[in-house]
Amino acid sequence: MGDPLQDRTRRLLTDYILFCARAPNTPEPLPTSVEAALLRSVTSQIQQEHQDLFNSFRDYQGNRLELVTQMADELLSNDQEFNWGRLVMLLAFVGTLMNQDRTVKRRRDQRNRLLLERDCYLIVSLLYNRLTGRHRSWLEAHGGWDGFCQFFKNPLPPGFWRRLLIRAILSCFFATAIFYIWKCL
């Protein structure tokens, strides 16, 4: 039998990201676990509360993996600042990027669908490695995915999410601007 934390982490990330990237008009698949259902619910609330901000990334045409890596570097930088809120904020952002295929032109649908599927698996792998590597001790100390479920039983005040979201988005914009300037030089 494998490592339960690794198994649950991979299953949760795969469930959530493929759920977000499903084709338009596709029925919503059932969540694969309690934590998957809760993650979908919490990220949906965050995306709705900050719809204008998240929608600005909905049609992102750049490299999704690079952008997620930058955002993960900002939000999951070290164990001292890592928390469930930062993780959920990152996953809400990832979910928004994965939803962007809904605006793709018909004649390029298949190519873009393949790129989206590739990005899904690369992003699952990136986040899985971060969570089960760098942040494994934090996850274990906070009860793993059972701790995640316990934490989100009682919702946090909107001010917490607003501050976290603003800091995350500003960091991402700053990182993207520096990356863009660096590429142009």
From Swiss-Prot:
Transmembrane intervals: 160-182
Superkingdom of origin: Eukaryota
Keyword Cytoplasm in annotation: yes
Keywords assigned by UniProt, alphabetized: Apoptosis, Cytoplasm, Cytoskeleton, Endoplasmic reticulum, Membrane, Mitochondrion, Nucleus, Transmembrane, Transmembrane helix, Ubl conjugation
Record's subcellular location: Mitochondrion; Nucleus membrane; Endoplasmic reticulum; Cytoplasm, Cytoskeleton, Spindle
Gene3D superfamilies attached to this UniProt entry: Blc2-like
Chain ranges for the short sequence motif BH1 as given in the UniProt record: 76-95
A GO cellular component annotation in the UniProt record: mitochondrion
InterPro entries membership: Bcl-2-like_sf, Bcl-2_BH1-3, Bcl-2_fam, Bcl2-like, Bcl2_BH2_motif_CS
Gene Ontology BP term (one): extrinsic apoptotic signaling pathway in absence of ligand
Changes after translation: Monoubiquitinated by UBQLN1; results in stabilization of BCL2L10 protein abundance and in relocalization from mitochondria to cytoplasm.
Function in brief: Promotes cell survival by suppressing apoptosis induced by BAX but not BAK. Increases binding of AHCYL1/IRBIT to ITPR1. Reduces ITPR1-mediated calcium release from the endoplasmic reticulum cooperatively with AHCYL1/IRBIT under normal cellular conditions. Under apoptotic stress conditions, dissociates from ITPR1 and is displaced from mitochondria-associated endoplasmic reticulum membranes, leading to increased Ca(2+) transfer to mitochondria which promotes apoptosis.
Quaternary structure and partners: Interacts with BAX. Interacts with BCL2, BCL2L1/BCLX. Interacts with APAF1. Interacts with ITPR1, ITPR2 and ITPR3; the interaction with ITPR1 is increased in the presence of AHCLY1. Interacts with AHCYL1. Interacts with HIP1R (via ENTH and I/LWEQ domains). Interacts with CASP9. Interacts with BCL2L11/BIM. Interacts with BIK. Interacts with UBQLN4. Interacts with NME2/NM23-H2. Interacts with and PMAIP1/NOXA. Interacts with TPX2. Interacts with UBQLN1; in the cytoplasm. Interacts (via BH1 domain) with BECN1.
Protein name (record): Bcl-2-like protein 10
